[in-house]
């Protein structure tokens, strides 16, 4: 006999753009998001009995996202995700969990003649600010915030040596190499009791995102990196130290390789070791290094 082991459904790829117009200054601020909302609850019969009476139409979910975006602030995204999730579990008594994922796309205000423009923006990278908000009836609100697609490179200040060498090893040890990666950093907040507690901590979300981004960039640039592993751990340590409300910080960093080209075949042209200036960026394969940094448990007395 079969049963529904797990089920959720909703609306994905809901694109939302909101503009805030300051009536005093005329300055406009824009936010563009891609939103996904998935619901869980007493919905098994829609799968097992073809009973649509328990289904909140995904089109209605889409409409709700637009309406709540009009009625509420959409920044920080941690707050808007909490507003959305709380709405669904309060509105529909048979819905007990709402999962909201928000991707905020980058629009950076243009500077024209040295001054910030009032209403013009540029997408200067594919970097996004992401949140995952899970609202569970009777439990609370779990939030994960993240930076994604933050592409960085440094042309020196990285090394890799002392690793396992055996019959499978061809990689040479290096004391100076190019280091490049696409940063994916995620920090998990301690559980919030409800929407009011989230509202009470609103300033911390933007502050922590800024701090996490700055820590990531500063450590990447200044660290004489012995390995991606060592560098990402130092980043996570600093973010946890900055924000006491965080439980964990997770990094996922692909190691995007740049290989020297031996050009000695052309008239003895030197382009290896200390003479290397021309490299070939590699698309794949690439290294992939992951780490979750948490807090040490306090020993019980």
Curated annotation (Swiss-Prot):
A motif (Microbody targeting signal) lies at residues 299-301. One of its GO terms (biological process) is purine nucleobase catabolic process. Urate binds at residues 58-59, 160, 177, 228-229, 255. It is found in: Peroxisome. Its EC number is 1.7.3.3. Pathway: Purine metabolism; urate degradation; (S)-allantoin from urate: step 1/3. CDD domains: Uricase. PROSITE patterns: URICASE (PS00366). One of its GO terms (molecular function) is urate oxidase activity. Disulfide bonds: none annotated. It is an enzyme of class 1 (oxidoreductase). It comes from the Eukaryota. One of its GO terms (cellular component) is extracellular region. Keywords: Oxidoreductase, Peroxisome, Purine metabolism. It catalyses: urate + O2 + H2O = 5-hydroxyisourate + H2O2. InterPro entries: Uricase, Uricase_CS. It holds the Pfam family Uricase. The active site is at residues 11, 58, 257. Belongs to the uricase family. Catalyzes the oxidation of uric acid to 5-hydroxyisourate, which is further processed to form (S)-allantoin. This is Uricase. It comes from Emericella nidulans (strain FGSC A4 / ATCC 38163 / CBS 112.46 / NRRL 194 / M139) (Aspergillus nidulans). The gene is uaZ.
């Amino acid at each position: 006999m079969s049963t529904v082991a797990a089920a959720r459904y909703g609306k994905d790829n809901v694109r939302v753009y909101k503009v805030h117009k300051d009536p005093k200054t005329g300055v406009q601020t824009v936010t563009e998001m891609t939103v996904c909302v998935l619901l869980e609850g007493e919905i098994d019969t829609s799968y097992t009995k073809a009973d649509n009476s328990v289904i909140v139409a995904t089109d209605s979910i889409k409409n709700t996202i637009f309406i709540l975006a009009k009625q509420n602030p959409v920044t920080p995204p941690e707050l808007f995700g909490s507003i959305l999730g709380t709405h669904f579990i309060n509105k529909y008594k048979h819905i007990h969990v709402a999962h909201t994922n928000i991707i905020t796309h980058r629009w950076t205000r243009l500077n024209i003649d040295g001054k910030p423009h009032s209403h013009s923006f540029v997408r200067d990278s594919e970097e996004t600010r992401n949140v995952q908000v899970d609202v569970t009836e009777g439990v609370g609100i779990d939030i994960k915030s993240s930076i994604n697609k933050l592409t960085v490179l440094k042309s020196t200040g990285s090394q890799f040596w002392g690793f396992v060498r055996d019959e499978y090893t061809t990689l040479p040890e290096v004391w100076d190499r190019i280091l490049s990666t696409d940063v994916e950093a995620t920090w998990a907040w301690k559980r919030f009791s409800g929407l009011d507690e989230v509202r009470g901590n609103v300033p911390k979300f933007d502050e922590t995102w800024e701090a996490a981004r700055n820590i990531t960039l500063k450590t990447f640039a200044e660290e004489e990196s012995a390995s991606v592993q060592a560098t990402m751990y130092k980043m996570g340590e600093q973010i946890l130290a900055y924000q006491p409300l965080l439980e964990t910080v997770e990094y996922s960093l692909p190691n995007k390789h740049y290989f020297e080209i031996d050009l000695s075949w052309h008239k003895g042209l030197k382009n290896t070791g200390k003479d290397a200036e021309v490299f070939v960026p590699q698309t794949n394969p690439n290294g992939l290094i992951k780490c979750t940094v948490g807090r040490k448990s306090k020993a019980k007395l």
